[in-house]
């Protein structure tokens, strides 16, 4: 609702346009939470495969479907899914598999104590090459903020949610 993921997706589009290998990794949302940005980036990945324009796109869902509105409904706990997802991303970073990584809602597993912040920071600081990592979410750990190149805080001034309106197709997803 505040634009954190949408802003990061804009950066992913820029990376794609430069021919970078783009990976989007959703750490809280499940595969059932379908957003327009996913369709757009997948279509751009397909365009790359067919024409060579832009770069390849990877989209992976690491979350179990847990949300603030309902409990998780997967065989794997949200904590285990976050740890497994981070291990996967760490391996991709170590092997320079991508040029641009969007770790969507990745601050939450750190804030909730599901991931070791020191280990995450060490992995990011020591990643090889010139890989770019964008992390979204609130409550970023101070250690992460200190090593980041850019930190942005999205602040809602006014939103239709405030007057009881539900999310709108085309606006929130």
Provide a role label for each language-model segment:
Residues 44-47, 130, 147:
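Structured helix-beta-strand junction loops
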Residues 58-61, 135, 152-153:
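Structural signal for conserved beta-strand scaffold positions within catalytic alpha/beta enzyme cores
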Residues 14, 40, 123, 143-144:
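Hydrophobic/aromatic ligand-binding patch that stacks against planar heteroaromatic rings
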Residues 28-32, 65-67, 107-108, 139-142, ...:
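Conserved nucleotide-binding/hydrolysis micro-motifs of P-loop NTPases
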Residues 138-173:
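Phosphate-binding/switch region of NTP-binding enzymes
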Residues 2-94:
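Conserved P-loop
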Residues 68-132:
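Phosphate-binding/switch loop-helix module in NTP-utilizing enzymes
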Residues 11, 37-41, 115-119, 147-151, ...:
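Short, glycine/charged-enriched secondary-structure capping and boundary segments
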């Amino acid at each position: 609702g505040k634009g954190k993921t949408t802003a990061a997706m804009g950066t992913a589009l820029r990376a794609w346009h430069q021919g970078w290998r783009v990976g989007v990794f959703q750490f809280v949302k499940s595969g059932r939470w379908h957003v327009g940005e996913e369709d757009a980036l997948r279509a751009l990945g397909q365009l790359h495969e067919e024409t060579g324009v832009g770069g390849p796109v990877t989209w992976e869902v690491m979350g179990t479907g847990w949300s603030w509105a309902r409990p998780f409904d997967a065989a794997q706990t949200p904590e285990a899914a976050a740890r497994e997802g981070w291990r996967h991303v760490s391996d991709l970073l170590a092997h320079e598999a991508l040029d641009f990584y969007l770790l969507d809602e990745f601050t939450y597993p750190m804030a909730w104590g599901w991931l070791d912040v020191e280990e995450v920071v060490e992995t990011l600081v020591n990643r090889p090459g010139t890989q770019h990592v964008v992390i979204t979410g609130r409550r970023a750990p101070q250690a992460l903020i200190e090593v980041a190149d850019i930190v942005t805080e999205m602040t809602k001034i006014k939103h239709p949610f405030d007057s009881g309106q539900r999310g709108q197709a085309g606006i929130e997803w």
